[in-house]
């Protein structure tokens, strides 16, 4: 076991906070409509230019191990916020830095860190309740467009295309983002279906950037039992291999020898396959497999109907234009099913909805109708260069997450105003001890920080703007894009409630844990001798292998 270095109390905290500041200062430059870009070096290919907080955070790894602890903790704030709300990563980072910096002053002054944490938790709970009161539901397409625009760094065209996509496939519909072929953003609605089952092995992934297995013009084998013996599959695999087309296998499960053989064939490029578990359970699984069969023009291979896997032919398989299999879901785009059969199936399910007695059954049946009839909206992002396209695509994906969050929990005034208005719920709050009161006071100062950062990035005086906004009421705030004060909701400056709430909760959670740390342990760096020069020409017998 390697030797460790241990630092205690202030000595540890100061080093850790230095790391917090390095990461937060890099991320916070991107906040607001006048936030700047950050350029990220890549080992291969062109650098990436981004305004996405979590993308910047993920790239930062510090040499000093104690500083790196701080950086990694704040990175965790950004990642968790991105996972839960899909946006608000920069706001979360700014809040975490503010809580840590303010908290450190109190700890240095002799306040008890545990009581400080309790005060912080009380203040955050009160602020979250106030945010819920401020929240208003998103009802119109215009509001959806406004939320999307703000999240995409005030790009109105991105907000509009997301609103159009939601109009076409519904707020619960499936929307995917792809690379475009022109300079303009385009929206296509493709007949398709998505279900919540992903690939059975990561070795099926053939698009590492998106972490998906993408199959173009595939066959679809639908089977209602487990597949564990590869011999059962061989006849149909041979037929598919002759056609030189990929294959998606949807079964109750694919395991053991069968899965291993499919993976090996896939890696070697002999037959491009992906296997997923069938969606749903029990009778619902049977019904969903039937839906997929009708959508793709195939047949469910089931012993109940007298069919067996060994005797399956290409005529029994479904087909689609494209299928994308991610870790947790599968999207079938443009299935080859007959339009009239799909219509009849939708009619049949709608009749079942009328007869359904439980809300749960009704909801599940409505989901099936949406999947069969709704389709998939594809936003194709256009740009002049690949670097610009990557940056723009990341913004579109962020905006899409933000609009979904807005539909889920509603919106609050943007531009850091909602957090300032939440101060009124914290102001009258009292803790059990003086130290808890200090924790509450700390949050009162920290919630100003997002607005201060937005204003600083816009080149204005932060303290003046914060005081002016605090003297106003309701939606009154500062629009950094125009440099004017006014009703931010009317001006379309909106933030999803879920994003603001998640950012505050995650920031306070990680930052207060950091304040209560009294020791830090890291591995000592070993002074290793310089590595020997590489052998010329590569190692024998390794020709043709990629590393």
UniProtKB/Swiss-Prot annotation:
Binding site for ATP: 30-33, 51, 87-91, 415, 479-481, 495
Keyword match Magnesium: no
Enzyme class: isomerase
GO cellular component terms, semicolon-separated: cytoplasm
PROSITE patterns per the UniProt record, alphabetical: CHAPERONINS_CPN60
Keyword annotations: ATP-binding, Chaperone, Cytoplasm, Isomerase, Nucleotide-binding
Pfam family, one: Cpn60_TCP1
EC number: 5.6.1.7
Protein's cellular compartments: Cytoplasm
Membership in a protein family: Belongs to the chaperonin (HSP60) family.
Role this protein plays: Together with its co-chaperonin GroES, plays an essential role in assisting protein folding. The GroEL-GroES system forms a nano-cage that allows encapsulation of the non-native substrate proteins and provides a physical environment optimized to promote and accelerate protein folding.
Alphabetical list of HAMAP family matching this protein: CH60
Subunit structure: Forms a cylinder of 14 subunits composed of two heptameric rings stacked back-to-back. Interacts with the co-chaperonin GroES.
The protein, known as: Chaperonin GroEL
Source organism per UniProt: Bordetella pertussis (strain Tohama I / ATCC BAA-589 / NCTC 13251)
């Amino acid at each position: 076991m390697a030797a460790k270095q241990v630092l205690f109390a202030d000595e540890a905290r100061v080093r850790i906070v230095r790391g917090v500041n390095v990461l937060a200062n890099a991320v916070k430059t991107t906040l607001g409509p006048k936030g700047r870009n950050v350029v990220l070096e890549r080992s291969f290919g062109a650098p990436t230019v981004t305004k996405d907080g979590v993308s910047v955070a993920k790239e930062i790894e510090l040499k000093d191990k104690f500083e790196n602890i701080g950086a990694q903790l704040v990175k965790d704030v950004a990642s968790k916020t991105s996972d839960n709300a899909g946006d608000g990563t920069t706001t979360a980072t700014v809040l975490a830095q503010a809580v840590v910096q303010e908290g450190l002053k109190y700890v240095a002054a002799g306040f008890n860190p545990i009581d400080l944490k309790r005060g912080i938790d009380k203040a955050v709970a009160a602020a979250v309740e106030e945010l819920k009161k401020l929240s208003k539901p998103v009802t119109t397409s215009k509001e959806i467009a406004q939320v999307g625009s703000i999240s995409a760094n005030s790009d109105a065209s991105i907000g509009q295309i997301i609103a159009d996509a939601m109009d076409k496939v519904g707020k619960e519909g499936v929307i995917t983002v792809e690379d475009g072929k022109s300079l303009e953003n385009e929206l296509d609605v493709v007949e398709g279906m998505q279900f919540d089952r992903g690939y059975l092995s990561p070795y099926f992934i053939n698009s590492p950037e998106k972490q998906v297995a993408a199959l173009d013009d595939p066959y679809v084998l639908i089977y209602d039992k487990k597949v564990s013996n590869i011999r059962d599959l061989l006849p149909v695999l041979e037929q598919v291999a002759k056609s030189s087309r990929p294959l998606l296998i949807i079964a109750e499960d694919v395991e053991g020898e069968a899965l291993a053989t499919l993976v090996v064939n896939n890696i070697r490029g002999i037959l491009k396959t992906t296997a997923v578990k069938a969606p749903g359970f029990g009778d619902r699984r049977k019904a969903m497999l039937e839906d997929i069969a009708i959508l793709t023009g195939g047949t469910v291979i089931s012993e109940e109907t007298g069919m067996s896997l060994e005797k399956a032919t290409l005529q029994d398989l479904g087909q689609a234009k494209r299928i994308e299999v991610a870790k947790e879901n599968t999207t079938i785009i443009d299935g080859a099913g007959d339009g009239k059969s799909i219509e009849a199936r939708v009619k049949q399910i709608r009749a079942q909805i009328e007869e359904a007695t439980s809300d749960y059954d009704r909801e599940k049946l409505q989901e099936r109708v949406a999947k069969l009839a709704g389709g998939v909206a594809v936003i194709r992002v256009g740009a002049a260069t690949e670097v610009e396209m990557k940056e723009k695509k990341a913004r579109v994906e962020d905006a899409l997450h933000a609009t979904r969050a807005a539909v889920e929990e509603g919106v609050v005034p943007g531009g850091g105003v909602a957090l300032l208005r939440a101060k009124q719920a914290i102001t009258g709050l009292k803790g059990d001890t003086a130290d808890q009161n200090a924790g509450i006071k700390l949050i009162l100062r920290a919630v100003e920080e997002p607005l201060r950062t937005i204003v600083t990035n816009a080149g204005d005086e932060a303290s003046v703007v914060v005081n002016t906004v605090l003297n106003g009421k309701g939606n009154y705030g500062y629009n950094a894009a125009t440099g004017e004060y006014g009703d931010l909701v009317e001006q379309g400056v909106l933030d999803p409630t879920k994003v603001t709430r998640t950012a505050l909760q995650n920031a306070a959670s990680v930052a207060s844990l950091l304040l209560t740390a009294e020791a830090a342990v890291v591995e000592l760096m070993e002074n290793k001798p310089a590595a020997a020069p590489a052998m010329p020409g590569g190692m024998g017998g390794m020709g043709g292998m990629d590393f």
